[in-house]
């Protein structure tokens, strides 16, 4: 009787022959990084941010809300915060690489403000100081399915007439009925119509990541300390009633709207899948089925997600996180298998493959109270801008 090893030889020969025919075939997407549930990753990221903020401020626990004075922030503190935020945004814009998709044409869409007669406006107190503009986010998502596809967004208003010079300010509505300052404009007197435009790209991107059905802006007269009259003198088309027939139709078509410029989804997917991945750090995820290391968008609302009311500005921010496999080639004609075995022997608990980690991070300016004293601080490395395999 032949030895047992010889009896197994006929069974091993077909397997050896198959391996010889495919010596250089890669193991597709091979990675020892564990598959992670998306919701679990988000929850862990939120909890990590909770500890990160407290640690950076050297706080053992969130500050008490009992001593915080009611009312808006002091004007000097708000001005300091706005200038810090603008400086950070300016530095980010200088280092932002031009995406490949910017070379191609953008689809332009107009989303009209919800008509002024809608019951949504009944929730806002009538005021001679401000006007309100609300938008249906389902129409926004229909025009721009993914936040990363948005190239630019402007809110445009048709000013009909203005008898005196006036300083106006634009605010963004938050879910807790507070308002965040965005921009301002000094308007000169004029009897002829003129379109006013405000860049609200960041705000609309934020709306696209949230689940609110209605979002809005407020246009207000600047509240000057030395002025007793804070009435909004600007006549904006779309905010008066009583018009009939064709005049009402024209009036409604020219009401405030969002002008959106975005890369069509099918074009973005084509560009994303066809270009070489030598620079993973510049890629944002275009869908939930992304198969490469990329930046996943995650918006943190301080009140909703962390239960915090002590951070006064901002109300939230895009923290983001990195996720996705980092595939490598494992060929039978290389010595990599020997190195891998040696690595696993000395590091049994570590990942044998590169993992998706943050590469570029941005700071986050905040306003919070210590007792009754407001403070402006800049927290370093809070926003994930790009990722890499490491």
Swiss-Prot record:
Residue positions the entry lists as glycosylated: 82, 136, 176
Site feature: Cleavage: 278-279
CDD domains linked to this entry: TGF_beta_TGFB1
Coiled-coil segments on the chain, per record: none
Family as reported in the entry's similarity comment: Belongs to the TGF-beta family.
Record's subunit section: Homodimer; disulfide-linked. Interacts with the serine proteases, HTRA1 and HTRA3: the interaction with either inhibits TGFB1-mediated signaling and the HTRA protease activity is required for this inhibition. May interact with THSD4; this interaction may lead to sequestration by FBN1 microfibril assembly and attenuation of TGFB signaling. Interacts with CD109, DPT and ASPN. Interacts with EFEMP2. Interacts with TSKU; the interaction contributes to regulation of the hair cycle. Interacts with TGFBR3.
This protein's name: Transforming growth factor beta-1 proprotein
Organism of this sequence: Bos taurus
